[in-house]
């Protein structure tokens, strides 16, 4: 990432929440401490996937190590963000995604993370490709801008929302 982007990441997370899985989490935090802990460099914040929603999927994501990762971050004064919103079953329909988004935005506390999975084209190898295209279309729409305004939510770059010394609950 750093070679291609020519900068350290603003945040660290993992596809399908692997950053908090036992076995991966320990390697990740070791690398983070080695690369950013002692040097005084700005520390990338960690996404703790503690899903602030009801349902089986939300409970499963949270159970996959969110508490352990958050405990490590707190013990090491590492910047991190929890809760996470945006978990759903990729059900069809643009109006369904819009309703989900309205609910997530309405319950979003300060310094929460909202995950999304957009793509601007279908990929036949991706089982959630249709949902990705629907998300992309919605996120580009005036309806999304209106939903943000109605909920009083402002999008920003992660490093601007969470100062390196700040910890979200």
Can you say where each PLM-predicted feature lies in the sequence?
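Terminal accessory/targeting
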Residues: 2-11, 21-169
């Amino acid at each position: 990432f750093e070679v291609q982007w020519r900068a350290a990441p603003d945040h660290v997370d993992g596809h399908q929440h692997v950053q908090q899985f036992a076995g991966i989490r320990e390697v990740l935090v070791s690398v983070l401490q080695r690369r950013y802990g002692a040097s005084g460099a700005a520390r990338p914040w960690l996404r703790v996937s503690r899903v602030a929603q009801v349902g089986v999927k939300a409970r499963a994501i949270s159970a996959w190590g969110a508490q352990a990762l958050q405990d490590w971050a707190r013990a090491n004064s590492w910047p991190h963000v929890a809760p996470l919103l945006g978990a759903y079953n990729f059900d069809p329909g643009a109006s369904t995604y819009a309703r989900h988004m309205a609910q997530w935005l309405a319950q979003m506390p300060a310094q929460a993370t909202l995950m999304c999975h957009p793509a601007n084209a279908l990929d036949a190898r991706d089982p959630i490709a249709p949902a990705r295209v629907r998300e992309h279309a919605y996120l580009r729409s005036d309806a999304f801008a209106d939903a943000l305004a109605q909920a009083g939510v402002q999008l920003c770059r992660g490093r601007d929302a969470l100062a390196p010394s700040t910890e979200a609950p």
